[in-house]
Amino acid sequence: MVLTGLMKTPPLHEEVEITIFGPGYGECIVVHVGSGRWIVIDSCKHGTKTPPVALKYFDRIGVNPAVQVELVLVTHWHDDHIRGLNELLERCEVAGICISEA
C-alpha cells in the first residue's frame, strides 16, 4: 500500500485526526485524540515484507508508536483486520489492547 496524499507531519497538539486506510481488503483506522496520543483500530498489512500500514504512517509523520499509541482495538478476527497485529503490538509498547468477541 502506497501512502500518497497523506500528511507528512503529525497533527497539532490540540487537533483530532482520523485517517482511514483501505477500504477493501484490509482496513485500519488511526486516530490522533490530541496531545500526541493515538489509537489504532485494526491492523492492515499487505504482503509479507511490508510493515502494517499504521506503522508506515507513523514512521512517515515522525510519531513514536512505542510511547504515543495508547490503545489498539481489534474489531474482529478476520485476516484482513488482524494481519500484522503481532508486529503492531510489538512496536506499540505501552498500548492497551481491546479485542471484540465478534
What are these regions (language model features)?
Residues 1-13:
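Short glycine- and acidic-rich boundary segments immediately preceding or forming the N-terminal edge
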Residues 2, 19-23, 81:
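Generic detector of intrinsically disordered, low-complexity, polar/charged segments
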Residues 10-65:
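Conserved beta-strand hairpin/beta-sheet module of binuclear metal-dependent hydrolase folds
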Residues 33, 100-101:
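Glycine-rich, histidine-containing beta strand-loop boundary motifs that form or position
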Residues 48-99:
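Active-site metal-binding motif and surrounding structural segment of the metallo-beta-lactamase
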